[in-house]
Amino acid sequence: MSNTAVLNDLVALYDRPTEPMFRVKAKKSFKVPKEYVTDRFKNVAVEISNRFGEDDSETVTIDSVPLPDLADILTLGREENFSLFIPKHRNLSAKLINIFLQAENPKHLLSIACYAHDRVNPYLFIYALSVALIHRKDTKSLKIPNQIQTFPDKYFDSQVFSQGKEEMTVVPQGLRRPIEIPRDYTASDLEEEHRVAYWREDLGINLHHWHWHLVYPTDGGEIVTKKDRRGELFYYSHQQIVARYNFERFCNALKRVERLTDWQGPIKEAYFPKLDSLVAKRAYPARVQDMTMQDLDIPGQNIKVDVDDMIRWRDRIYRAIADGFITATNGSKMNLDDVTGIDILGNIMESSELSPNRQLYGNLHGFGHLMLSYIHDPRSHHLEPFGVIGDFTTAMRDPIFYRWHAFVDDVFQQFNGSLPRYTAEQLDYAGVQITDVNIKTPNAPDNEFRTFWQQSDVDMSRGVDFQDPGSVFVRFTHLNHEPFSYNITVNNTGNGVQEGTCRIFLAPATDERGNPWLFNNQRVMFVEMDRFKVTLRQGQNTITRNSTQSSVTIPFERTFRDLDTNRPAEGSEELDIFNFCGCGWPHHLLVPKGTPDGFKAQLFVMISNYADDKVEQDLSGSCNDAESYCGVRGGKYPDKRPMGYPFNRVARQGADTLQRFLTGNMIVQNCRIVHSDRTVRPRS
């Protein structure tokens, strides 16, 4: 069996994940050793395999190998929900990841995975296998299916599945119609927060959050957790999520999200997710209005944490920021300086295994998610599962996610506010002056973005178990924008060619009341649009950059990539890149929605000195086209500056507005975002 064939066989394990291995998967019929078959099916496996086998299926014979000890891992039942916020689940996933990482080669891994497949909780199995495949050198070129294909129940209303199963059972392949999801299916317009549900519940955003945490696990050993500036990237990627959400709120006449700081008062936001777990066979619980966070005691999950614990952890972190150092497990002091301090703080806040002292600083971010997710049954009296905020895959659907992360980001901003302010000389680039910038959108006035609604189809058949094979599509509506380009005029008065990093950000022009911004309020509202290297010859230079080249986003086709289509050649560099780059922000949400009369925004462009920005490394064959939020596979973050530069610190004395903050290598352009309430039908 060739290595390519084995890799394809590993991908087949994602097909219909709750079905046993002896059922045909992705047109492959797996013949597993008898000892691999669970007791439930030992007497019927061959008969069922023959009955449901497909005539054109390929037979894959699995070798018998020494079997791993799964005893601890099996303490999580097959029909339970799985959450990486639950420490017990994190530990179990780390154990399974290490079992998969220690396999001698892909063929050995396939055999172990086939054994684990029918025993381990499906959510846990797919997560651990995905992390292992991404981080093993001999499988990193494997194209991992996106989670919509594997577990569509985490993305679609439960009504979709009854319609889908009917379509798959009754209607022949080729005659099936897409099942359309209404844009407003979780609440009515009477609910104010529902104005931005199209953004929170967007499939691409939730896939991005899932994939980011797949690439940056909190546990599993250094091979999967120890990545360059991962704590800082946790801070920055989530800060940008909150900033983008606030931008979207402004476009819908909502004020900035309020930080969740009162942990003993009522929470006004309710949320009813309308999702059912097809693995746990239970609905995700709702949260009604005015519930309060309470001490958690969930014996079945070994969770016991009090609100007072959270307050102690918060206060210790604030004290560390004020003191300028944290205390490591061995009692030594680690300075929170202006280079590594934000990274250390990020590891503490996320509470990854890179945290210098989990015992002292706790798990503030993670247990915040858990307290909110069990708010309906904090002591497990009713044996209710956690809500959507307790799962990376579904958390961004819930309005409370953004209130919690507004608090988390405020902790980081407390630290950023303690750092030395950039001087004008530090920000400037001698000899480089930006004289003009404009945005070009086809058939639109200069400096105007245009957005609209787009309908797209995604195949969910691979995640619908125990049904006849064949595609069944779900049609959903999402925001999109017209392609555009930046045209930047730069004057280089230096003695020769200069190299720089062009940094492009966008922010609302005024606050929610229509008042001019103070710089230190506006700086956290800027969303990164692009970052790229430029070469400036002497004299005037014109830089043109297309929106599709953004360092923040990945294309629509990669966000919703299919197992079989758009696949690069086996063994090619493109295939390795294709897989890791599933992490980027969805391109269809690069531009905020805007308003019909044109939402006023400010485009900020800066060119910094590349000599101060560059990181020496070979990026050939690495994924770096969505580097801003996801970094570079197997390499260092490709910008030496702090993430979010130059908006990561409080402004210098006297620079109380954006205009006063500017130096010669910066420019601001007023622009508008015009939304057309039209819907474009699916792409062919």
Swiss-Prot record:
Sorted UniProt keywords: Copper, Disulfide bond, Glycoprotein, Immunity, Innate immunity, Melanin biosynthesis, Metal-binding, Monooxygenase, Oxidoreductase, Secreted, Zymogen
Q: Name one GO biological process term.
A: melanin biosynthetic process
What does the record give under GO molecular function? metal ion binding; tyrosinase activity
Temperature notes read: Optimum temperature is 35 degrees Celsius.
- What modifications does the entry list under PTM / processing? Precursor cleaved by PPAF1.
Activity response to pH changes: Optimum pH is 8.0.
Any one cellular-component term (Gene Ontology): extracellular region
SUPFAM superfamilies named among the record's database cross-references:
Di-copper centre-containing domain (SSF48056), E set domains (SSF81296), Hemocyanin, N-terminal domain (SSF48050)
Q: Which InterPro entries match?
A: Di-copper_centre_dom_sf (IPR008922), Hemocyanin/hexamerin (IPR013788), Hemocyanin/hexamerin_mid_dom (IPR000896), Hemocyanin_C (IPR005203), Hemocyanin_C_sf (IPR037020), Hemocyanin_N (IPR005204), Hemocyanin_N_sf (IPR036697), Ig_E-set (IPR014756)
Entry cofactor note text?
A: Binds 2 copper ions per subunit.
Q: Could you name the domain of life of the organism this protein comes from?
A: Eukaryota
Quaternary context: Dimer. Might form a homodimer or a heterodimer with PPO1. Might interact with PPAF2 (via CLIP domain); the interaction might be required for PPO2 activity.
What does this protein's UniProt record list under function? This is a copper-containing oxidase that functions in the formation of pigments such as melanins and other polyphenolic compounds. Catalyzes the oxidation of o-diphenols (N-acetyldopamine, 4-methylcatechol and dopamine). Cannot oxidize monophenols and p-phenols (L-tyrosine, tyramine, gentisic acid and hydroquinone). Binds to the surface of hemocytes and is involved in hemocyte melanization. Activation of the enzyme in response to bacterial lipopolysaccharides (LPS) suggests it may play a role in innate immunity.
Name used for this protein in its record: Phenoloxidase 2
Annotated organism of origin: Holotrichia diomphalia (Korean black chafer)
Primary gene name: PPO2
